[in-house]
Amino acid sequence: MANILQKSIAAILLSGAILFPCTSHAMDWNDYDESPHYAPTAMHQGYYQVDLVDTLSIDEYAPPIYVLSVNSFLVSPDGTTKNIGRTTYKLNYETKEAWLLTLKKPEWFPITTATTSSRDLFNKLFMKAFGIPFIAN
């Protein structure tokens, strides 16, 4: 059942149901970059938006899983080139686990939350989406 949910989330993301809200520049999938370093770099530059993806849970007592789609502009150092990218994370607030969606298979790839950079990234995303940090210091 989890595999069906993963594939349906990936299908929604690929179908364009969650689009980058920029009317002057259409999404170009040739510019897509699913690197886990893409969203943090764009976030550092200040060009990003966090969208919460609705998820379904079969077990009402299971800890909530949050799926965040991060749409971002990545600007080159000279300020002339802009690329559009999207990175999708799945976060378990209770267990502090995180995953990155890879669209080639599609599947969720686990990401460590033990490093300072990953804690900063997930805290910033969770603050933007919910107003609270993902991992308290």
Provide a role label for each language-model segment:
Residues 11-19:
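Bacterial N-terminal signal peptides
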Residues 21-23:
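N-terminal signal peptide c-region/cleavage motif recognized by signal peptidases
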Residues 1-12:
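Bacterial N-terminal signal peptides that target proteins for export
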Residues 25-86, 92-137:
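N-terminal secretory-pathway/extracellular module detecting exported/lumenal segments
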